Each structure stands twice: as structure tokens, then as C-alpha cells.
Amino acid sequence: MIRLPVLAAALAAASLATTTLARADEGDILVQAGHEGRPASCAILHVRACNLGASSADGTMERTWTVAVADEATRVLRAHGYSVVRRPADYDAHDTVKAAVFIHFDGSEPCASGASVGFPATTSRAFVDAWETSYRAFFPYRFVGENFTENEHRYYGFRKVDAPEKMLIEFGEMTCPAQFAWMKPRLTELGDKLAAFLMERVPK
């Protein structure tokens, strides 16, 4: 007889394998939750740099927040008739969409960072500016800039999708107690704002 915990673990592993080994897809928008599925997905896809993401002072993991925001944005977009390709951190596919967003929260020396964006040269200035204008008006803390690290500018996810608009979004620094306290009750709202931005910028 298979014990229930063992069966549950086996089903979870099978589900993860199905997600990470997904086929290439096409749609209107790709939404990736940063670090989702790690560390398990790193072993399946032989990822060497298995970055597990940031964590707050109370142990909250970045990958729980990215999933919450990504799932809410995906829910809203699909409810409005958009075709959404929803991806975790690691997956064996190359997708084609009109716009791709990659969701993250920063980790740093406490309160040394804030919100930021990363994007390749092919992303339009109008797309970046529209997000920055919207989010700066909402986020009451520091906006640290664009492509301010190589990991942002050359994010691996950009290579896994064909899209005219690609952008990594750092919503804020979860290692800063003030920013963490502000963002924690607003994860659903962050997903809603991201969906609203994408619906304004991406035609169905």
C-alpha cells in the first residue's frame, strides 16, 4: 500500500515534471513567476545556477510572492479574453507571444534597493515608460533604475520567448522591512495592476 504522504509527493513531482517539460506555446502574453518550482526544477532541467530567490527577515520566500502575483495577473487577463502562457522559473520550451513579463522581488542589503525593471534592447521605450509611469505613481518607495545589473539586462528568460516586448519587473525589495510591510498585503493588487497595464499595452 502506498502511504498518502508518499503518494502526494509522487503526484507533486509528476506535476512539476509536466510543467517544466512543457511544449512550446503561443499566446498573447507570457507571465513567468520568478524562482517558481525551484529547487526541484533545477535537477530536472540540469540548471547549474539554481538561484532560489530572496527571502525576508521573517523567512518569507520570494518565490511564494512571485507565484501569487503571477497567478492573479493571469486570472485577470484570462477573464478578459487574453491567451496567457503561464510559466515557472525553469521549463523546456520556447514560446511566442506579443509581450512577456517576468515577475520578481529584490533582495539586497536591507533598504539598499527598491523597484526596478530589466529588458533587452528590442523592447520598446514606450512599453517600459508606460510601466514605470504607472508603478512609480503607486509604489511609495525607491525606484532604482533600469537594467542596473547584468542579471536584469540579460535575464535568461528573455532567450526563451519570441516577443516584441519583454520586461523583468522587480516590484520592490522584500529585505527592506518598510517595503516588505507595504507589499505584503498588496500582492493581489500588484497582480491586478500588472494585468491592467498589459491590457492597455497589448492588443488581443
Stretch-by-stretch model annotation:
Residues 69-73, 131, 194:
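Hydrophobic residues within alpha-helices
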Residues 14-21:
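C-terminal segment of classical bacterial N-terminal signal peptides
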Residues 82-85, 148-152:
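Short gly/ser/thr-rich secondary-structure transition/capping motifs
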Residues 25-92, 97-100, 106-107, 113:
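Active-site histidine-acidic residue metal-binding/catalytic motifs
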Residues 29-30, 100-112, 116-118, 149-204:
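Active-site-adjacent mobile loop/cap segments within catalytic or ligand-binding domains
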Residues 60-68, 121-126, 180-192:
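Soluble non-cytosolic domains of exported or imported proteins
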Residues 123-151:
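Active-site-adjacent substrate-binding region
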Residues 1-9:
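Bacterial N-terminal signal peptides that target proteins for export
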